[in-house]
Amino acid sequence: MKKTTSQNGFTLIELIIVMVILGIMAAVAVPRYLDSIENAEESTENAVISSIRSGLKQAANDSLYTHGRASWPTNPFEVFVAGQEPAGYTTDNSLANDDGEWTFFAVGNVTKISHQRNDNRRFTWTYTKAVSYTHLTLPTILLV
C-alpha cells in the first residue's frame, strides 16, 4: 500500500503577504481612529460650552423674572443642576491637569474654564461675567 502524506498549512510566502496586507490596513486605520477620538473630544467640548451658554441665558432669565434684574453666576458651572456637571468637573480652582478634567478658576480678574483632553492637551476659555442684560454685555465664553 502506498502511504500518502498530506501537508496542511500556509507557505512562508502566503504568511508574509498576509502580514504585509495587515500592516497596510493598520497604517490606514490607526490615524483614522486617532482622528475620530480627537473629533469626539472636540465635539464634547463644544457641547459642554454650548450647555453653559444656554444655562447662562436661562440663569439670567430666571434672575430677571425673580428679582427684576438679570444676573449671572460667578462660576459658569453653577448653571448645571447639582450632579449634572460634565464628567470630570472639579472645583479645585486650578488649571485642568488630569485627562478629561474640567475646571473653573480665577487668576486675578480673569476667570477661565479649562479642559484637558486625553492626549494631555489643555484648552481654556475666558469667561467674562456680564453686568447687565443688553446685546453688548452678555456673558462671553471665548476659546483662548
What residues fall within each predicted segment?
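Membrane-proximal N-terminal amphipathic helix
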Residues: 38-66
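Conserved small/polar residues in nucleotide/adenosyl-binding loops
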Residues: 134-140
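Extracellular/periplasmic head regions of type IV pilus-like filament subunits
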Residues: 61-121
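Alpha-helical hydrophobic helix detector
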Residues: 16-32
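N-terminal leader/signal peptides at the extreme start of proteins
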Residues: 1-10
